[in-house]
Amino acid sequence: MIDVKLLRKNPEIFYDAIKKRNMDTEIIDKILEVDKEWRELVAKVNELKAKRNEFSKLVAKAKVEKDNEKASKLIEESKKIGEEIKKIEEQEKKLEEEMQNLALNIPNIPAEDVPFGKDESENIEIRRWGEPRKFDFEPKAHWDLGPELSMMDFERGAKLSGSRFTVLYSYLARLERALIQFMLDVHTKEHGYTEVWVPQLVKRDAMLWTGKLPKFEEDAYCIEKDDMFLIPTAEVPLVALHAQEILSEKDLPIKYTAYSACYRREAGSYGKDVRGMIRQHQFDKVELVWITTPERSFEDLERLTQDAERILQLLELPYRVVSLCSGDLGFVSAKTYDIEVWLPSYNSYKEISSCSNTTDFQTRRSNIRYRGSDNKLHYAHALNGSGLAVGRTLVAIVENYQNEDGSITVPKVLVPYMGVEKIEVK
């Protein structure tokens, strides 16, 4: 959530931020208008309360002077003031709720070094690692290779659950499981993360705290009877773990990693990536979350991104890192790096991880603070990233490690997890 006090003091920061995101600034006009009305009512209530206090003193004086008639009149006047205060406070509360709802729909302020641009076509490439493989045969897409191995089944996935669901069998099912274990092992043993097992159903509050609601409600799977949500990412429970808590600066940064299934309706993606496993309603992901201090959060974003990159390096999969421009930046993010893996079926790089610094946007919503060395309370900063999206990593391995005979070579680091060096029809 935005800092309303900062908006009131420096509205130009928010006008500029909204323009950079290519959004209409009308919402800023509206919240400032509501805030002005609210402050006027607050001032009016304070004025009336002061007046009522004066009447209380006059009542006490009249009683001392045994002027009961005067005291009765003053008490009546005081009651009228009290009733007026009550009416105004009800209006005040409504305006406060309206202001809160408006604030929940204002995105985070882009960091100063975020490149300006209208959409993903203006994202800036930062670096590349590895070279795309040059095949001496015509490579196949995973949506052909998997079924030919009888290990990837889109038809039965659709029969069970509809479009954008996949069934994996045998060694591809094992590969999915191996990747999860491998990623968690690297992040916990090499990168110092604490592994967490989180619920995959969360309350509405948890979605609100992390900025998934109200903005993205139509993209979420909701259990209406219980008002619970299937998580779109483990970022939601990992950040919300510390909601309404006061942490100690000496315990920061907190670094969590968690595997979970993720559930997304993909409401706005009709016609995109309709073939294969790239865009699914249910997919596995290993998530990385940091709770850190404002002073080091952008440095920590670099570290988190490198942790995600390390998985691709160990798997020897070529990738690139891009910095998202202001027009492509996510709602909660102040700065984001996308990591994109090379996929032969697309003859291009496709997103496999998104690493973001949300600054104090999520921590204000969830009221995550820490006591600093100055003994004052400060809002922490929250970072998140995929480390990695498991299904897309599996797809990248299937396509980049394929052989002419239709078999798939298992990356060296995964052989101990898989128990085989090659996936093939037997």
UniProtKB/Swiss-Prot annotation:
Disulfide bridge partners, by residue number: none
One Gene Ontology term, aspect cellular component: cytoplasm
Binding, L-serine: 233-235, 287, 386
EC assignment: 6.1.1.11
N-terminal signal peptide: none
Metal-binding among keywords: no
Catalytic activity, reaction form: tRNA(Ser) + L-serine + ATP = L-seryl-tRNA(Ser) + AMP + diphosphate + H(+); tRNA(Sec) + L-serine + ATP = L-seryl-tRNA(Sec) + AMP + diphosphate + H(+)
UniProt pathway: Aminoacyl-tRNA biosynthesis; selenocysteinyl-tRNA(Sec) biosynthesis; L-seryl-tRNA(Sec) from L-serine and tRNA(Sec): step 1/1
Coiled coil start-end: none
Origin: domain of life: Bacteria
Places the protein is found: Cytoplasm
Binding-site list for ATP: 264-266, 351-354
Keywords associated with the record: Aminoacyl-tRNA synthetase, ATP-binding, Cytoplasm, Ligase, Nucleotide-binding, Protein biosynthesis
UniProt enzyme class: ligase
Single GO BP term: selenocysteine biosynthetic process
GO molecular function, one term: ATP binding
Family affiliation: Belongs to the class-II aminoacyl-tRNA synthetase family. Type-1 seryl-tRNA synthetase subfamily.
Notes concerning its domains: Consists of two distinct domains, a catalytic core and a N-terminal extension that is involved in tRNA binding.
Assembly and oligomerization: Homodimer. The tRNA molecule binds across the dimer.
Biological role stated in the UniProt entry: Catalyzes the attachment of serine to tRNA(Ser). Is also able to aminoacylate tRNA(Sec) with serine, to form the misacylated tRNA L-seryl-tRNA(Sec), which will be further converted into selenocysteinyl-tRNA(Sec).
Protein name as annotated: Serine--tRNA ligase
Provenance organism: Thermosipho africanus (strain TCF52B)
